[in-house]
């Protein structure tokens, strides 16, 4: 494993937790400016991964599933959105009610404090960053390191779920984020189209910001 890949794995695995740790120093009710800065740092993780791939590993962007979109990209994104947003809740909603309701309610209460435009920013950028870290980079590099694509994908999916524990709690992370991660991973392995995953993931979050989270104030 090269130093560049080791750095990329560190960014993908520890970066989100580092941003959460920074947010703790901002207090319980940070200003919108502080939250914008924190989100910019979070987005910087994806930029760092792209720079590592291009200039550190000297690999093409399609080594993490990032390539020019086609009509198939849009159809894949649409199908993934339907599966994740409309069908998956039949599985996850009962699990959340049984194991992750407290975490869900606490997380939604925090999001409800935010203005609508900032929720759009969080949703639109959040899906892009998470897909870059967990699907594009971690799946591909862990698969290469282990020599088994299924193992790399499994480890990346577990990492995705665990990354949500500090904010949403263990119950919600296992009941909702883990199944969502499995679906996103299956689609990535099937089509290996990172942009399709980004579109579906970000769209789902943005819509959920207004259909699940109540209006501020």
Outline where the language-model segments fall.
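N-terminal hydrophobic targeting signals that begin at the initiator methionine
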Residues: 1-2, 217
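Alpha-helical transmembrane segments in multi-pass membrane proteins
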Residues: 2-56
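Residue-level signature of transmembrane alpha-helical entry/exit and packing/kink sites
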Residues: 4-9, 35-39, 69, 73-77, ...
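Transmembrane helix-loop-helix hairpins at the membrane interface
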Residues: 17-18, 86, 111-217
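Juxtamembrane helix-loop-helix connectors linking adjacent transmembrane helices
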Residues: 25-37, 60-126, 144, 212-213
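Alpha-helical transmembrane segments and their lipid-water interface positions
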Residues: 49, 92-93, 208
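Structural signal for the C-terminal ends of transmembrane alpha-helices
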Residues: 50-60, 187-191
């Amino acid at each position: 494993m090269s130093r560049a890949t080791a750095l990329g794995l560190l960014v993908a695995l520890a970066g989100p937790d580092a941003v959460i740790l920074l947010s703790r120093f901002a207090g319980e009710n940070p200003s919108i400016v502080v939250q914008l800065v924190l989100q910019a740092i979070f987005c910087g993780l994806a930029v760092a991964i792209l720079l590592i791939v291009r200039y550190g590993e000297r690999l093409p962007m399609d080594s993490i599933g990032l390539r020019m979109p086609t009509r198939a990209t849009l159809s894949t994104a649409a199908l993934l959105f339907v599966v994740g947003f409309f069908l998956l809740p039949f599985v996850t909603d009962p699990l959340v009610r049984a194991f992750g309701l407290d975490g869900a309610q606490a997380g939604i209460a925090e999001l409800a404090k935010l203005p609508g435009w900032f929720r759009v920013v969080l949703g639109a950028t959040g899906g892009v960053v998470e897909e870059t870290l967990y699907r594009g980079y971690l799946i591909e590099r862990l698969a290469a390191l282990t020599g088994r694509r299924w193992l790399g994908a499994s480890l990346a999916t577990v990492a995705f779920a665990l990354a949500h524990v500090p904010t949403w709690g263990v119950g919600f992370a296992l009941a909702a984020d883990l199944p969502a991660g499995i679906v996103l991973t299956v689609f990535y392995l099937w089509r290996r189209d990172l942009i399709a995953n980004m579109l579906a993931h970000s769209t789902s979050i943005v819509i959920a910001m207004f259909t699940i989270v109540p209006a501020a104030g």
